[in-house]
Amino acid sequence: MTTHAVLSDREMRLAREASEWRLLSMLFECPSDLWRLQILRLAAEVADPDLKSAVEEAQQEADEGLFHHAFGPGGPAPVREATYHLTVELGYLMSELQAYYNAFAFQPRSAEAPDHVSVETAFIAYLKLKELYALRCKEEGLAATAAESAQRFLQEHLSNIAQPLCERLQDSGITYLAKTAVALARRVGPPSSPSTRFPIVQDGESEGEFGCGVAQDN
């Protein structure tokens, strides 16, 4: 399959959105010196003022102890989707998420649980790149699959975390995380109805046809 050098408006939008989602994901990861450099580089690729401001605050504010205080056991803001479910069994949720990740050959770069907000947001970034690559290869059907899967994943998974996490972090006193959570909630919207469950894409259904290139989760 061939690709074209000039990006269309849609492709440029997807590239921008992928960078924004990747930055969101990283801002929910545990800070380190390398992490600070990485989020600075990513911030140069995005225009979102909330994300840029969060990165600026993180350079001064973020540290491992503060991260674990906010997100660790007993902290004010749980970052795993399972925390916000009242009835879904943990094993079912994990298998559902893993089925999604396997279907698109997504391998998280972090060791966090599959339902951690940093992993779920990284998956959206990855799907944006999948859609972009498919468009570059003129594979509209594959691009549509990636786009539809991203939208369903937002509605059925990240929507369970985004709003309640945002509300909890506003009172945490941790400015960079509060701003990051606002940016996430703005993209995701309110929690979806629990009655609108959707069928999981199974492992053998989709991934083999994405032949133009495999998006890397860097």
Place the predicted regions along the sequence by residue.
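Surface/interface-facing alpha-helical segments and adjacent flexible terminal/loop regions used
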Residues: 1-218
